[in-house]
Amino acid sequence: MKNTFRSLAGRDFRYYFFGQAISLIGTWVQQVALSWIAYRVTGSAFMLGLVAFSGQIPMLVATPLGGMLADRFSKRNILLWTQVVEMAVATTLSVVAWQQSFSPWILITASAVLGVAGAMEMPTRQAFITEIIHDRSLLPNAIALNSLTFNAARLLGPAVAGFTLAIFNEPACFAINAVSYVAAIYTQLTIHLEKPAGNRTSGSLIEALEYVRRFAPARWLVAIVAVTSICVSPFMTFMPVYAQDIFNGGPDLLGILLGASGGGALAAALFLASRRSLAGIGNRIILACLVGGVASVAFAYNRLLTLALPLLFVSGGSFIMIVTSCNILLQSLVPEHLRGRVMALYTMSFIGMLPLGSLVYGSLAHQIGSVKPVFVIAGVISIAYGYVLMKVMPGLTQMAQRALRTA
């Protein structure tokens, strides 16, 4: 266990870790409340997908700008300002919920603003970790622990949201998120940066694109995350449908379903944090693609809550095993002067593909009148891609090992 949390020995990363963990719990509380309200207000799977699309599409459009800003300016200042914006949105949503004046357009607008802020924040946050981890050998562990905070919040946040929605009310969910940002902002202000806050490079996104295009391991890592995000999109978008229409539950059951997925993700992040080397990481990516795909197909045909929970656990664990492993490899390989922009491409493939999946799957579910085919399609894609990776991964692993030896 000591080996799992070894990066927390450093003061700066320890402060960042705990402040971010508190803030992310609030973020997940708000996310669950938004999805629940969207389905309650509209009663439409298509509108549920559209609200998700409006929050995720900025990741596809604006993330390159976030990556360029991260390479040119103080990463800490970018994070602070984006969190101030997100706190303001959470406060506004709490007031709107208290007045009971939600409409589809308010939900879409709020999601879009949060999406733009996230597009600035996420690549910056990925690159910021290298500034507060001063021993490069600890970088894989720090990245895994960063994923751990996200997934611990993903486990706790929906449970808190379900309890808050059932016992208190919707405004309380947004108020919890607004207050949670205080922890993140405070801890980031107390971090002592030992090197310049920004790389101040004037390079363009084209330089990062050229690096990814020419270097096969980086190209495949970005592609793997993109395909995985498309495959996991139904689990992100349609859980309110399953909670209400399939399992005849309410917001508390939605929290349980999302918590099961978060539990699997948390277990995967803990496993990766306990690894002392990158050995076997390629095989773990392949296995997660195959297992996650099977879980998606099985979930589509399942109508038993007792079976749905372990399937969601497996799906969540597979997803995080893939994207966090790819993150660790990419951050280990990428040159420092390209880090912000390359991680912007990673974020585009990670988060930016979700809106396409949400919109396409939402339209498909609306036309068919069922969400079952959506999960089947996603599962088949994941299994097929896992088979492709079985063919190409050995060569990619050799190229990555050579690059790491010469870094």
For each feature predicted by the language model, list its residue ranges.
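Short amphipathic helix-loop junctions that connect adjacent transmembrane helices
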Residues: 32-45, 238-252
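C-terminal transmembrane bundle of multi-pass solute transporters/carriers
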Residues: 61-64, 72, 78, 92, ...
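Juxtamembrane intracellular "pre-TM" segments in multi-pass secondary transporters
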Residues: 1-13, 193-223
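Primarily residues marking transmembrane-helix entry/exit sites
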Residues: 9-17, 45, 104, 108, ...
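Substrate-agnostic recognition of the 12-TM MFS/MFS-like secondary transporter fold
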Residues: 14-31, 55-70, 74-89, 106-165, ...
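Transmembrane alpha-helix termini and helix-breaking/packing motifs in multi-pass membrane transporters
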Residues: 35-41, 93-99, 156-176, 245-246, ...
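Helix-loop junctions on the cytosolic side of multi-pass membrane transporters
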Residues: 127, 131, 170, 174-201, ...
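Juxtamembrane helix-start elements in MFS-like secondary transporters
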Residues: 44-52, 139, 250-254, 258
